[in-house]
Amino acid sequence: YCSEYFSTKWASIKGLPQNMTINTQYQKVIDYIKKHKSHTKEVAMVGGEPLIMKENNLLLDILPEDVLVTVISNMTTDFDKFPVPNKLLGRKRVGWSMSFDNIGKRFEYVRWGSTWEQLNKNVTTVANRINNSQQHGGIHSVYNIYNCTRLCELKQYALDKGITILWQYV
């Protein structure tokens, strides 16, 4: 969770009013990509939860099909309620970084408010796409106190889905 203080910190660092909407900056990015889309090779959707951001929906509409889209997601979004996940699944070149560290009830404990059922459904959907297309990716997990005794379970889960794990150490 980011408090309001941190979500507006970037504006104060740049000397901008904190009540300035992100639409101005976003429109500049969209205009730049439209102008240079023939030279755009990769776009990264990171920060917040990119699968629910309306801005990413428009971005996917203007990106050429050959542009690689990389996304870091906690994978807890209901894919049926937002357009971005399905647009990504329909593209040829997507790199998925699925950010979670535990499975089952332990996942629900660490990601309070999320359900294992939803995450597992989403990971299964993305893993099937990865295994049958040019899309790529896997689990990006942080080795921590909540999973240090359950690493084999997470590894087996990844193997069963046919995806990899990239371990991030803290």
Predicted regions and their residues:
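Core AdoMet radical
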Residues: 3-27, 38-53, 64-81, 87-121, ...
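Conserved alpha-helix/loop element of class I SAM-dependent methyltransferases that forms part
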Residues: 32
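Aromatic/hydrophobic pocket-lining residues that form the small-molecule binding cavity
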Residues: 56, 119, 151
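Conserved Walker B catalytic segment
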Residues: 57-62
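Hydrophobic positions in alpha-helices of CheY-like receiver
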Residues: 63, 123-130, 158
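Catalytic cores of alpha/beta
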Residues: 145-159
